[in-house]
UniProtKB/Swiss-Prot annotation:
Residues 498-512, 655-679 have a biased composition (Polar residues). The gene is ddx20. A motif (DEAD box) lies at residues 175-178. This is Probable ATP-dependent RNA helicase DDX20. The keyword Cytoplasm applies. Pfam families: DEAD (PF00270), Helicase_C (PF00271). It catalyses: ATP + H2O = ADP + phosphate + H(+); a ribonucleoside 5'-triphosphate + H2O = a ribonucleoside 5'-diphosphate + phosphate + H(+). Residues 443-456 have a biased composition (Basic and acidic residues). Belongs to the DEAD box helicase family. DDX20 subfamily. Keywords: ATP-binding, Cytoplasm, DNA-binding, Helicase, Hydrolase, mRNA processing, mRNA splicing, Nucleotide-binding, Nucleus. It is found in: Cytoplasm; Nucleus. It comes from Danio rerio. One of its GO terms (molecular function) is ATP hydrolysis activity.
Length: 761
């Protein structure tokens, strides 16, 4: 038999309202349940059924499809758990009950209730199937599982894989049915529910439970159920009787973080004025929830954050801390607004107004569980949030009150499990009257007024006049002992009080909480880093940083040096071309001429050819000087400027007219040294204008005609060189300025990432 676990609330320990109590001595034994189920109910703390349990359990045991609506915290989980356990056939190892929940936390909580009530049932197997856990573990659990509880996504996956056999399922339960069946495009629950429902046997019983019953839920459930029976208590008044609801208007601002700061200040003031056991703070944004948890922890208030962005283990750990009273404040999104049962939570704060009235009712239902007393406070800005809050109050007929300022001390009617003493101090430091003897006196008086309580915790919350709230809590658990007789008489005289208060400074320091010095929280700065060391560290971070595996293809060492490294080979090659252009041209012209003509021309026109060659050499040199700077000019420039000039000249030469491109390609394939006798061989391969120029230079013509043709040729080539250089420069700068913003943004982003990583250390 499984160990019994307390799953019910103790009715005698706290005040209960009428919406969870029934008149008369009705007990669970009058509901005709099986003996193991009754034993499990008694062992887990269930003494008498609530009104919703009294009406719904008998109808469910008759096999009817039920739609159950009741207020938050009135025992709906116990309804379908009791019906499911009482209908099980333990000898059959197949899955007989399937329970779906909208969140993993609710599924885990349902599993705990089932195991607590079914603790007296020998051989009961109940398992949870949720995301974040290995599939192999789920397959192992499904070999013998009477009750399967899980989220729709994982259950659908197991059915598709064939691991979960649904042919023997006789009871299908939808907990928080309005959330599972809501018509929302952002939620895929409805599609998954339809798929799961279609795979189940036709002859089955179905239960749908929720604290809210919107109109859309009735339309959705009509598709699944056969003549369902409605079990609804106080449908026109969904609010809890023991819960006081307040709202507070905070100044609106155009910047969201300013509004958040205003709400946080009001929240800290509320925590310092209202004594509470545990509190739930709801935020619409994940980032704000985590930020608020950090702020409260820095103020000394134990706070834990839970959201959908955390891992499954972190989420379960946060819920365990809340239920085991390991944290005072839980900051959450709407992940825990439904179904979560924490008995000691008596304060709920909405940092943001919820999106709809259903979410609001579920949020405030986390306080005032099973008829207890509690307080709910909602912060809203002027304008849209205020109008939305008023619409919710009108829709649900809520008794919504404005939070008084200043907050009165008696706003929390129920006494807390630990006593909270609020003291106003003149200085932020710890006062002299903070003595252990006075705390013992306060404890003795409280134990005298409440002798039935075995243990309690004393918390001292101090508030400074200057507005800085500091909470110094000294939590001390006292064993069950009564003060000695005559003890209070000895403490009454003032002289004895002064004598007892004379405690050394060392003893007083020992009673205070041990907080590390401020220097231990600071990162010790080492020696100063030079720029070269910082550069090496930055490159190491880019290559070998956390989560990085970078292969360096090109290293940027500055604009001019980078251009030299990348294009250094091309620069040298182009310089060789410029210096050998004339030699290649002459050698190719000699190769193309016949031998006889070559000899005759060399004998008759040797002087003329030498003159024309000198003129063509001057022309080629002038052309090369227009695109390639002279050696003296390059020597005069700095090293970092030389590469830039060379690159610009290369770019200008690459855009020369098409008539010169084949010539350069041919020259690059030739050897640099050719015999001078082959100069005329290139004559037939030259373009038309070059042939004309060469022929006219060898003919005996007048000086005027030769001068005119030379001037026209030089003028034409100069114009072509000018426009080609102009286009080259324009294209270069267009491409450069087009990509420069992206290069700057990339560099800025990488530097910002590097700085952030350095700040962490």
């Amino acid at each position: 038999m499984a160990a019994s676990v307390k799953a019910a609330h103790e009715l005698q320990s706290r005040t209960r309202t009428d919406d969870v109590l029934i008149s008369g001595g009705v007990e669970f034994s009058s509901l005709l349940l099986s003996k193991p189920v009754l034993e499990g109910l008694s062992a887990s703390g269930f003494q008498r059924p609530s009104p919703i349990q009294l009406k719904a359990i008998p109808l469910g045991r008759c096999g009817l499809d039920l739609i159950v609506q009741a207020k938050s915290g009135t025992g709906k989980t116990c309804v379908f758990t009791t019906i499911a356990l009482d209908s099980l056939i333990l000898e059959n190892a197949t899955t007989q009950v399937l329970v779906l929940a909208p969140t993993r936390e609710i599924a885990v909580q349902i599993h705990a209730v089932v195991m607590a009530i079914g603790s007296a049932m020998e051989g009961l197997e109940c398992h949870v199937f949720i995301g974040g856990r290995p599939i192999s573990q789920d397959k192992q659990h499904l070999k013998k599982c009477h009750i399967a509880i899980g989220s729709p996504g994982r259950i659908k996956q197991l059915i598709e894989m064939g691991a979960l056999m649904v042919s023997s399922i006789r009871l299908f339960v939808l907990d928080e049915a309005d959330k599972l069946l809501e018509d929302d495009s952002s939620s895929s629950f409805q599609e998954q529910i339809n798929w799961i429902y279609s795979s189940l046997p036709a002859n089955k019983q179905m239960l749908a439970l929720s604290a809210t019953y919107p109109e859309s839920l009735a339309q959705q459930l009509s598709r699944y159920m056969r003549e369902p029976t409605f079990v609804r208590l106080n449908p026109t008044d969904p609010g809890l009787l023991g819960l006081k609801q307040y709202y507070k208007i905070v100044p609106s601002h155009s910047l969201p973080h300013k509004v958040f700061e205003e709400k946080v200040q009001s929240l800290l003031e509320l925590f310092s004025k209202i004594p509470f056991n545990q509190a739930l703070v709801f935020s619409n944004l994940h980032t704000r929830a985590q930020h608020l948890a950090d702020i409260l922890s820095s103020k000394g208030l134990p706070a834990v954050c839970i959201s959908g962005g955390l891992s499954q283990d972190q989420r379960l750990e946060a819920m365990w801390k809340l239920k085991q009273y390991q944290c005072r404040v839980l900051i959450s999104t709407d992940l825990t607004s439904r179904g979560i049962d924490a008995e000691k939570v008596n304060l709920v704060i909405n940092l943001d107004v919820p999106q709809d009235w259903e979410t609001y009712m579920h949020r405030i239902g986390r306080a005032g569980r099973f008829g207890t007393l509690g307080v709910a406070v909602t912060y809203c800005c002027h304008g849209e949030e205020e109008n939305k809050m008023m619409a919710i109050a009108q829709k649900c007929s809520l008794d919504l009150m404005h939070l008084p300022d200043p907050i009165p001390p008696g706003i929390m009617e129920e006494a807390c499990d630990h006593d909270v003493i609020i003291e106003t101090l003149s200085k932020p430091k710890i006062p002299d009257n903070f003595k252990p003897e006075k705390k013992k006196k306060a404890k003795s008086e409280q134990m005298k007024s409440k002798p039935s309580r075995e243990s309690h915790i004393s918390v001292v919350i101090t508030e400074s006049v200057t507005g800085d709230k500091s909470c110094s809590r000294a939590e001390t658990k006292t064993k069950n002992h009564s003060p000695k007789p005559g003890r209070q008489k000895q403490m009454a005289p003032a002289a004895n009080l002064q004598h007892d208060s004379t405690i050394t400074q060392k003893q007083q320091n020992n009673t205070l909480p041990k907080i590390p010095p401020l220097s231990s929280f600071k990162s010790h700065t080492g020696k100063r880093m030079t720029f070269d060391d910082a550069l090496v560290d930055y490159e190491t971070f880019i290559r070998e940083g956390p989560g990085r595996s970078v292969e360096i293809i090109h290293q940027y060492d500055g604009f001019y040096r980078s251009q030299d490294k990348v294009n250094g080979l091309h620069d040298a090659h182009d310089e060789d071309e410029a210096s050998e252009s004339y030699v290649l041209e002459e050698s190719q012209s000699h190769q193309d001429l016949p031998p006889a003509q070559e000899v005759s021309e060399l004998s008759s026109e040797q002087k003329t050819s030498s003159e024309s060659s000198s003129e063509s050499e001057m022309e080629v040199e002038s052309e090369s000087s227009s695109s390639v700077p002279s050696k003296s000019t390059l020597e005069a420039l700095p090293d970092n400027k030389v590469s830039l000039v060379r690159n610009h000249s290369e770019l200008a030469k690459s855009t020369l007219p098409s008539t010169r491109v084949p010539q350069q390609a041919t020259r690059s394939k030739q050897k640099p040294c050719q015999p001078q006798s082959q100069d005329t061989a290139h004559h037939h391969n030259l373009p038309h204008k070059h042939r004309t120029a060469s022929k006219s230079s060898r003919r005996p013509t007048g000086p005027k005609r030769r001068t005119r043709e030379t001037d026209e040729t030089e003028e034409e080539e100069a114009g072509q060189d000018y426009w080609s250089s102009y286009r080259a420069w324009a294209e270069y700068y267009n491409s450069y300025y087009h990509h420069s913003p992206y290069n700057w943004m990339t560099a800025f982003y990488m530097n910002s990432v590097y700085i952030k990583e350095m700040m962490k250390h």
